[in-house]
Amino acid sequence: MAQNNTPVRALVLAGGGARGSYQVGVWRALTELGWRPQIITGTSVGSLNGAMFALDLYETARDMWLTIRSQDVMELPAEDAPLSELHAFLKDAVTQGGMDVTPLEEIVERVLDEEKLRKSPIRLGLVTVEQKTLKARELPLEDIPEGKVKDYLLASAACFPALRAHTIDGVSYLDGGYRDNMPTALAQKMGAE
């Protein structure tokens, strides 16, 4: 229990792509009610939204979800692209193990500040999956090496085979939803009641 004998509250955010927009609506409602968690755990889009929540970036998240398009997250050919370009795109996606998510990486780089995230009063945890072993990695922020938070957030959202696995220090990771799409157990391990 927390020092004032109130339960430690957690917000658990699942993965699921477009579900992320609903999470921002829940965030608004919770804020209007004056409810704040001490812990946020997330998988995939839930880990990305959780990081923005921990940084109190509601307007940024809302605006992003109101305007986001598929090409804002992954490299896609233009709608009027010639057939040869579409063929090359599909061949690249298959041979490279999924679509290129450079646009998503750029959003994460621009929006999320690791130093501020580490100083947030809200503790963050995420789930990703090692591609080789298919074992879940439950990672409270404090267990993630300095300079690697953005990488692990992207790894948590690497929805293979549609998107490429995310490699960190020679280890490839997949979307945490393959093993734990709703990381309540991680929230409990981090102290939630």
Predicted regions and their residues:
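Patatin-like phospholipase
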Residues: 6-108, 136-154
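Active-site-adjacent alpha/beta core region of enzyme catalytic domains
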Residues: 83-193
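Basic/polar N-terminal segments that are highly enriched at the extreme N-terminus
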Residues: 1-4
